[in-house]
Amino acid sequence: IEAVSSAIKMTRAGLGNTDKPIGSFLFTGPTGVGKTELARQLAFTLGIDLIRFDMSEYMERHAVSRLIGAPPGYVGFEQGGLLTDAVTKKPHAVLLLDEIEKAHPEIFNILLQVMDHGSLTDNNGRVADFRNIILIMTTNAGARATQSHALGFAKATVSQDNSEEIKRAFSPEFRNRLDATVQFTALDEDIVLRVVDKFLMQLEEQLHEKKVDIHFTNALRKHLAKDGFDPLMGARPMARMIQDTIRKALADELLFGKLKNGGTVHVDYSESEQKVVFDVQLPRKKETEKVDALV
């Protein structure tokens, strides 16, 4: 976060390189630790668009033409490229290239031009301006080194092995044009609790639209943080756990149960019963309804 924010502050202060994107970053680390989420939150905080490409869709050599447009005489020449058109329409954005290691090596050659000169020419000769783009690429390369040394090895050894995998996956000219390679490590206990609060806050906002107030106990939060987090899989299993234990039960109450007209729910975790328990309270009737009932 500090590396990304420093690049943005230098650009806002007029001290950045005006011929390059605001920043070019490679996020590395295991799955489910927040690499993609950081890009989303960065775009949200800055109030700019997020342009996301899943690079697993660009594993073939001909996929390059989808990004910059097909050459003359080929199908799709009139349509232009997905990448160049997206940046032309939204010149101030966070460009997220997810799982970049899965892309064809030819795509890396295109990114060299973007990172070095802040521009890219499409099939029609139009130049897309990347100078106001924050380029973020994510990769799981190096995650195996982190997992294999999860027990009994020093952090320096893990970091060294991680760097070696990055060097094998990406060419020197590609790595040399990056502003920073940001290594994400496994989430600690405090961060996991914050992730729990984030997921529960999302659920609270969704239920608020249904006129339902929901409250969660600390026992539930600690239970989700302990049993819903997997060091190898990250925070994604926690979302599935919340869906299986809380969301499904609330869905039945919203559609067929006590919460059809709103209400209040208290969600707790019972250590003795080893399960999530719900306390549903019906909504209070309005004063006007009470008056009508008396009449």
Regions found by a protein language model. Give the residues of each.
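AAA+ P-loop NTPase nucleotide-binding core of proteostasis motors
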Residues: 1-295
